[in-house]
Amino acid sequence: VNVWAFRSRLGIVSSDLQQNYAAYIRTIEVVVSGFFASVGIWNHHQLSDDQVERSRAVLSEIGIGDLADRPFGQLSTGQQRRVLLARALVTEPANLVLDEPTSGLDLTATFRYLDTLRHLMSSGRTIVLVTHHIHELPPEIERVVLLKEGEVFADGPKASILNAQNLSTLFDAPVGLIQSNGWYQAVPG
């Protein structure tokens, strides 16, 4: 397997990546760095006008085009996560891996982020969403893999895997489950 070819088809968003960017770097530079799979822009990187234009377009597509020239460190956590999503999307990867993308976000920012994910999924993009919170699973998620102690505990269609029994066993606690309009919510069981 050619790792570089595989990497070009994969966009990644994680809180670890968010912490690696200097506060002074401009938002547009964070997004452009996605073309180089780097943290920041370095002297050996040769930026094209097309790359900068594409980066601005992706920021606009996800509703934060007005933040392009602001320092990354001046953005809210939710805005920073959306910038990282734009960075992941700038090369138009076939697949996205989102590792706890809404951790630390307030309710409004979480809902906004999930709405963006729903839009991406409806356009046919494959998304692997890593989360500890069932309420973050958009209705468009079809397959769920539950992990316990590093092992696959359950794997299959969301409707058959997400149930109170599986979740209670998974978390070693009584868990109830509420479903509404394709969304799930875990509650004390």
Predicted segments, located by residue:
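H-loop (His-switch) and adjacent beta-strand-loop-beta switch element
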Residues: V144-P157
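Conserved catalytic motifs of ABC-family nucleotide-binding domains
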Residues: E92
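H-loop/switch region of ABC-family ATPase nucleotide-binding domains
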Residues: T131-H132
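Catalytic Walker B motif of ABC-type/P-loop ATPase nucleotide-binding domains
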Residues: L96-E100
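Hydrophobic anchor residue at the start of the ABC signature
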Residues: L85-A86
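ABC-family P-loop ATPase nucleotide-binding domains
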Residues: S15-Q74
